[in-house]
Regions:
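Short, intrinsically disordered, low-complexity terminal segments
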Residues: 20-25, 64
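Alpha-solenoid helical repeat scaffolds
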Residues: 30, 45-72, 76-579
Length: 579
């Protein structure tokens, strides 16, 4: 039998405590010592009916409770509702409301809540339950007086009540009606910032953006520096699809109120979403100053430092995360392995990867060790390690096939890499990951026809796969004369992932191929500012050279090549234009 959520003895002691118990000829008064520790409902004695507990009422109480214990909820609801009507006891009506809500019987719950509110008109809890049930049943006009009464009697809790209105009203489908109701409820409180906040949030839900902005601004004016109002205003601005405007607002707010940590955290995350990594790291570092032992913020700064190739800082922050008791230490060890691998410190990377003992990163860490073995001219050892790893599901089979193909691609054995991926597709049919990787191998084999076929299949399988559109568009721009088609594909990728620096780079490259040099320079400069990648530097230099800015192009290539001496794209650009 499933354990009921309705405690049996505690309910009866609460209900029977103040009344005379009569069973046959015997009667006795329950004392406080007979009750357990369950607190009494807050019911004024003035609202308790002066009645004795008859055998019939006692039987019904027992029946209702035992029915609830045995999950016969309809019987329990009906019995409690009968008792609520006949006894006039608000505690019984409260119980009837609770059981009816749990039983998902809105009609009975609403009737019980009405009785409860009538029987104990001073009860805020009764009003809250009744108003919530009325809202859930779409009866906003009937709920309004109860909500008004709750607010008028709340005293210092009026502000918090306005802040909770959204959760109460969110379930109602007619958002315009909710916005109108909140406007009416807020009118008597022209100086209360929470009232303006509630109006702004309801207007936002209703799509009334101008009204939402105005109300959020009013909330800020009534309580300057209030972070909740600022965050809501930023959320409203985000509906305008203008990330720069949102960033500008948060930046201005933080200039005025630099201690606003909640706003700074949202701003930092927004910068990460927009791929503005240097600015994001700066904000997370400011957050970290106020909470230096927070492992999540420390990890964020470490990963952003790694993204920006500030390896020394990344090492310091990631090592610190391990000392702060981070909940997923193997994840941090994996990141440290990546950090050393990016610096071609194979021994250091293998040491960190080898310390990953469990979790999602276990197989991934061994795959990275295999890749590093291959890069040290130990290809067969690397492949043997991969083949020894367990593949317990489709995801792991996919990852292992990808890793094996990567080893072969790294030594330019593209045909065998193609074969491995094709074999993987027989095991995991229609894997968009394997199809995408096979397309990249096809490009190395100069088989643009195979690349296009695989990428179009990826797009068919996953229409939101931004990188498939980007890869196909870039290849068509770089390797064919199908520039208009390439532009259309890349614009689709930009729409799906507007802040991705590599997709922005592709857009700049197709603009260059179309002869739109000014557009190309602006776009590629944006991409490079977001991510100073060597291939982006190579493309931007090509555009600068074509514009006659040969010295600027050469300086850019040389600086980027110094930081990325293994870049084939930069080496080719320098050899072509400076020798």
């Amino acid at each position: 039998m499933r354990v009921s959520r309705f405690p049996f003895r505690s309910l009866l002691t609460v209900l029977l405590l103040p009344v005379t118990v009569m069973a046959g000829s015997a009667s006795a008064q329950l004392s406080a010592e007979d009750a357990d520790d369950t607190p009494l409902p807050a019911v004024s004695r003035a609202h308790l009916p002066p009645q004795e507990l008859s055998a019939k009422v006692l039987y019904q109480l027992l029946l209702a409770e035992i029915a609830a214990q045995r999950d016969r909820l309809n019987l329990s609801v009906n019995t409690y509702l009968d008792l609520a009507r006949s006894t006039g006891d608000p505690r019984v009506s409260q119980r009837a409301t609770e059981v009816a809500v749990f039983a998902r019987n809105p009609k009975a719950a609403l009737e019980a809540a009405r009785l409860w509110s009538q029987q104990d008109p001073d009860s805020d809890r009764a009003r809250q339950n009744l108003s919530g049930l009325l809202v859930s049943e779409g009866k906003l006009s009937e709920a309004r007086p109860y909500l008004e009464q709750m607010l008028s009697k709340a005293g210092p809790q009026t502000g918090p009540l306005f802040m909770n209105l959204h959760s109460l009203l969110a379930q109602h489908a007619d958002k315009d009606a909710v916005a109108a109701l909140v406007e009416q409820l807020a009118k008597p409180y022209p100086k209360l910032p929470e009232a303006s906040y509630a109006v702004a949030l309801a207007a936002l839900d209703a799509g009334k953006i101008d009204r939402a902005k105005a109300a959020a601004s009013e909330a800020d004016a009534k309580r300057p520096g209030w972070e909740s109002a600022a965050l809501l205003y930023g959320q409203i601005l985000q509906t305008g699809k203008d990330p720069a405007a949102v960033r500008s607002f948060y930046r201005s707010f933080l200039d005025k109120y630099p201690k606003s940590q909640d706003v700074r955290l949202i701003y930092a995350r927004l910068l990460v979403d927009d791929k503005l990594f240097p600015a994001a790291r700066e904000q997370f570092q400011a957050i970290l100053k106020a909470a230096p032992d927070n492992p999540d913020f420390t990890l964020a700064v470490g990963l952003l430092s790694m993204q920006l190739q500030d390896y020394a800082a990344a090492e310091t922050y990631l090592q610190k995360v391990l000392t702060l008791g981070y909940r997923e230490p193997d994840t941090v060890r994996f990141y440290l392995g990546q950090l050393h691998e990016e610096q071609k410190d194979w021994a250091g990377a293998a040491q960190w990867y080898g310390q990953v003992e469990s979790g999602d990163q276990f197989v991934l860490s061994r795959m990275r060790i295999a890749v590093m073995l291959s890069r040290q001219n130990r290809l067969q050892e690397g492949r043997d390690l991969l083949h020894s790893l367990p593949a317990e599901n489709a995801e792991q089979r996919t990852l292992l096939a990808q890793a094996d193909a990567q080893l072969l691609s790294d030594v330019h054995n593209y045909q065998e890499a193609w074969n491995v991926l094709s074999d993987g597709l027989t095991r995991v049919p229609d894997s968009s990951e394997l199809l995408y990787d096979r397309a990249m191998v096809a490009e190395k084999m100069n088989r643009i026809d195979l690349l296009e076929a695989d990428l179009r299949k990826v797009i068919a399988l996953k229409p939101e796969h931004a990188h498939a559109y980007n890869a196909l568009g870039y290849t068509l721009a770089d390797r064919t004369e199908r520039f208009s088609e390439a532009l259309e594909l890349i614009q689709k990728a930009v729409a799906l992932a507007p802040g991705d620096p590599f997709i922005i780079d592709s857009l700049g490259w197709v603009q260059f191929r179309l002869g739109r040099l000014e557009d190309a320079q602006h776009t590629l400069k944006d991409a490079y500012d977001r991510q100073p990648d060597p291939e982006i530097a190579a493309h931007l230099g090509q555009v600068l050279w074509a514009q006659g800015q040969k010295d600027a192009a050469t300086r850019l290539w040389q600086a980027s090549y110094k930081a990325n001496p293994d870049s084939e794209a930069l080496r080719a650009a320098l050899e072509q234009h400076t020798h």
